[in-house]
């Protein structure tokens, strides 16, 4: 034991040079290694989740408070700084995706963890796109993005950066998956807007309902806009996926469970957007209920197929998560809200 490590260091350096030259797969450069160390220590997505949830909840409280008491001028003193914080958190979230992309050398939405990170990003982006029309939409989007990121950071999601399986080594990964998965963010926004509309309709005091009626109409307009964007993205993603399927498997459509449920989701949201032509489904209440229930088809397409059905797309799933107990409990509460909102509408 001489205590000198120079020779060992030289051997390691020679091994590194040899691996860089002879390895069949490209190794990480020194810059990539340093960025990965920073990425692992910074926990960018965890802090983004905490920021989204905290700031989104505060923003929602103050925006709703301003609606109920219009006399208070909270726009410049509180709401604008909170909106600025959401933008900064979104930039932090975006930087995390960019760093992961640089480290892996591929688009970071190839497994369950990465797709959740991307859906959260698309949700926050959807809220920012509607910021000029409604601060409330941004508040809902930020809070929902925080919840998605929080779920992604739970133990059953594996955050490891892994190499792509052969079928995913295609430029279509960046195009098809990005487009079709982004639609889930807009559908999530519509779900939250529908919930908030039902909550406004459940206000027991008729005077408060009358005060909120213009905002209910505004929420419906934004909800329809969000559904239109989501449906456009979903439809484009399905067609792009068909082209990729033809390149990978030699057929455009094979009624694979993922393909089938994506088509079902497209039909569901197309019906929701056209239901206003039916007199019985023309009301704001009916539209809000449908926009809330429609998300169930998205959950089945995204989670159900990946984890509980045999599909050619199951390679994107990763580890199997716990059961859908939380989803069932959530929808039980949602059904209770729907019933109470419908009762309030009839009574008024």
Each PLM stretch: what is its role?
Residues 1-38:
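Soluble extramembrane regions of membrane proteins in the secretory/endomembrane system
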Residues 16, 44-68, 79-106, 110-162, ...:
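Hydrophobic cores of alpha-helical transmembrane segments in multi-pass integral membrane proteins
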Residues 26-56:
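Cytosolic-side membrane-insertion boundary helix
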Residues 35, 164, 249:
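Short clusters of hydrophobic/aromatic residues that line enzyme substrate/ligand-binding pockets
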Residues 74-75, 215-219:
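Alpha-helical transmembrane segments with an aromatic anchor "belt"
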Residues 166-167, 314-318:
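Membrane-interfacial helical/loop segments at transmembrane boundaries in membrane proteins
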Residues 204-216:
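Juxtamembrane inter-helical linkers in multi-pass membrane proteins
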């Amino acid at each position: 034991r001489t205590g000198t490590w120079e020779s060992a260091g030289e051997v390691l350096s020679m091994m590194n040079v040899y691996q860089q030259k002879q390895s069949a797969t490209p190794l990480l450069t020194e810059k990539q290694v340093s960025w990965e160390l920073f990425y692992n220590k910074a926990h960018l997505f965890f802090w983004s989740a905490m920021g989204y949830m905290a700031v989104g909840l505060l923003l929602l409280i103050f925006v709703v408070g301003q609606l109920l008491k219009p006399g208070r001028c909270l726009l410049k003193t509180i709401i604008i700084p909170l909106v600025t914080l959401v933008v900064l958190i979104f930039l932090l979230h975006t930087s995390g995706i960019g760093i992961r992309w640089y480290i892996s050398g591929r688009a970071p939405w190839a497994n369950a963890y990465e797709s959740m990170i991307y859906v959260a990003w698309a949700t926050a982006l959807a809220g920012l796109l509607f910021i000029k029309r409604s601060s409330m939409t941004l508040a809902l989007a930020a809070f929902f993005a925080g919840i998605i990121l929080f779920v992604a950071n739970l133990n059953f999601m594996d955050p490891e950066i892994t190499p792509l399986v052969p079928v995913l080594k295609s430029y279509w990964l960046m195009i098809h998956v990005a487009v079709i998965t982004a639609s889930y963010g807009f559908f999530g926004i519509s779900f939250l807007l529908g919930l908030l509309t039902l909550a406004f309709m459940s206000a027991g005091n008729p005077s408060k309902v009358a005060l909120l009626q213009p905002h209910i109409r505004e929420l419906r307009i934004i909800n329809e806009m969000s559904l239109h964007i989501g449906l456009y993205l979903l439809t484009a993603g399905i067609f792009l996926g068909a082209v990729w399927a033809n390149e990978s498997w030699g057929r455009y459509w094979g009624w694979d469970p993922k393909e089938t449920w994506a088509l079902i989701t497209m039909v569901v949201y197309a019906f929701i957007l056209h239901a206003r032509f039916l007199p019985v489904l023309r009301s704001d209440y009916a539209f809000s209920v449908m926009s809330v229930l429609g998300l169930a088809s998205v959950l089945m397409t995204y989670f159900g197929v990946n984890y509980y059905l045999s599909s050619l797309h199951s390679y994107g799933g990763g580890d199997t998560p716990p059961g859908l107990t939380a989803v069932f409990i959530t929808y039980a509460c949602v059904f209770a809200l729907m019933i109470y909102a419908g009762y309030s509408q009839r009574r008024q």
